[in-house]
């Protein structure tokens, strides 16, 4: 695998952000042995830090991704020869090789085929391996959620007229890095008219009195494990209409959360949500796909399982049964089509044998009013 998150899952090695896209590191994990790691920086730096990988940390074999145009590329074949040699060493040359996490998978498969090695698609194997979290993983995710709560608190404290969406993103990210976050995506921050229709970015719009502001602490990683948690705030006193929209969104998300436990299917959970895209004023599920959805989370922002109204409406898609140890993010949006505001909420939920546990603890039951000088 060349996938940074799967490399970390298998070996504990953290691939830094600049090195992720170039694919200078990979792991070979034999079915009858321990993993071998190729890294793009100095092995001497990491060997003392990773005693569990003793004798199995290898120097860079070259950067094939920027240059390879076909399967005969000599640098690409450095990796093919290295893997082939290890397969021979472990006596597994007749086994299939699962490939994962490279943009040049077709070239690798062709090069391995010439050596008599059959390749298969490896991503689902790793997805399934990571889908159920251990107690250690869950505890790390609790810490990540606590860090996200600090970020949301920093955002709430900063909301006032004149502050821009990008300022709120900066406040949230600063709080995360103060707590040792090792990576984060840019927070989603939409305000006022930007909250309807739903969007997931941020800009330099200035917050004004009466605006709703929704913020997603998404992709914040502690020891690699991520969060994805939306909250909606109001700059000043909220109107009754805004409070009603918020309550509608809260009821929608928690009606689904209350269904969660091991043995329930994703389709049963989604059955708690609107049964037609017309609810939001649209004609097709594709137009409203993000408005009531869910996804697993862990070392990636989007682990299995996926709860998608589009997938559910697609003929032949089978339901997924929830299992204890899954961590799922559920997210909903409400607002009138063509309206001037919208509400977004999201919770991180641990699936348990007898129910669920909401891991995200930042207050959610009522619309939080920020900058209220007239109380």
Residue ranges with predicted function:
Residues 1-375:
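Active-site neighborhoods and metal-handling regions in enzymes and metal-associated proteins
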